[in-house]
Amino acid sequence: MRPIIINGRFLLHRTTGVERYAREIIAELDKAIPAGSITMAVPPEIENVPVYQNIKVIKTGKFKNRLWEHISFPWYVHKQKGISLNLCNVAPLPSPGIVCIHDVKIKATPQYFSKKFRLWYEILFGNATKRAKKIITVSEFSKSEIVKYFKVDPDNITVI
């Protein structure tokens, strides 16, 4: 089985609902898995690296911010022959792996977002919904919206 590598870039952000979801899922995973079976990769600029009992955390890459997420992180996943687990809406363009899409408000209520923001997230979500090995989401409603706006097979989406 390929190793699972969590995208830890969310640790750079202030905690909102999306980041809290990621932290809670990871905390529960940590309790449920054998030691060393999952790794979390984080950007080098993270100062307070979380400590888990069973999840190994590793600083990797030379880039920062989005470049880390779309270059350094997927490169690390590739070198480890792993699969990425992306819990905060965004997955690397080169290899989305498993991605959690919390909502698709950019499609449902586009008037609330700038054109630039919508375009960026439409690219990210479009890539993830077409190429991800698995999509997870937070509710049946979000699942139905992903199916509606991105024409995803509902069997490829799991609600957690």
Describe the residue ranges of each PLM region:
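Carbohydrate transferase catalytic cores enriched for Leloir-type hexosyltransferases
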Residues: 1-160
